[in-house]
């Protein structure tokens, strides 16, 4: 197995989290009472149960580095996630930043920020 790191993200409710990410093509590969692992291709997200999380004050985030940012973004839009600046879940469209990186954003139902970064 290749060395790797995976983000550990909060979930107030595994059913809601699993359904949300399932619409984006993620499948469950492990679940217990307090831990869940979802996979979409080579992208693995691990979730811990955090029932008392206040999404409005959550500072959790991670980066998804994607070979096809546009396709993943389209999947998010097709799942009904809106481009807006308020509430969650929500999307922010990809744009080229000063760094030269093309980055969008997905905010999940627990207000976790997933930066969507196009691979070179």
Task: Annotate the PLM regions.
Residues 1-3, 54-59, 97-98:
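Short glycine-enriched loop/turn motifs at secondary-structure junctions
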Residues 1-15, 62, 117-120:
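N-terminal beta-strand motif that seeds the catalytic metal site of vicinal oxygen chelate
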Residues 6-8, 37, 61-63, 103-105:
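Short aromatic/hydrophobic contact patches that present stacked aromatics
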Residues 17-22, 111:
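Conserved active-site tyrosine of GNAT-family acetyltransferases
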Residues 24-28, 81:
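Conserved acetyl-CoA-binding loop of GNAT-fold acetyltransferases
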Residues 29-60, 64, 113-118:
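Conserved short beta-strand elements that form part of the metal-binding/catalytic scaffold
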Residues 64-110:
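Vicinal oxygen chelate
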């Amino acid at each position: 197995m290749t060395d790797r790191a995976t983000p550990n993200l909060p979930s107030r409710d595994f059913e809601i989290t699993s359904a949300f990410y399932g619409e984006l093509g993620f499948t469950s590969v492990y679940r217990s009472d307090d831990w869940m692992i979802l996979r979409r291709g080579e992208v693995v997200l691990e979730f811990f149960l955090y029932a008392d999380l206040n999404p409005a004050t959550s500072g959790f985030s991670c980066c998804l580095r994607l070979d096809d940012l546009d396709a993943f973004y389209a999947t998010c839009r097709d799942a009904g996630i809106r481009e807006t600046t308020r509430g969650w879940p929500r999307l922010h469209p990809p744009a080229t930043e000063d760094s030269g990186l093309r980055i969008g954003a997905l905010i999940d139902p627990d207000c976790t920020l997933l930066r969507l970064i196009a691979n070179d």
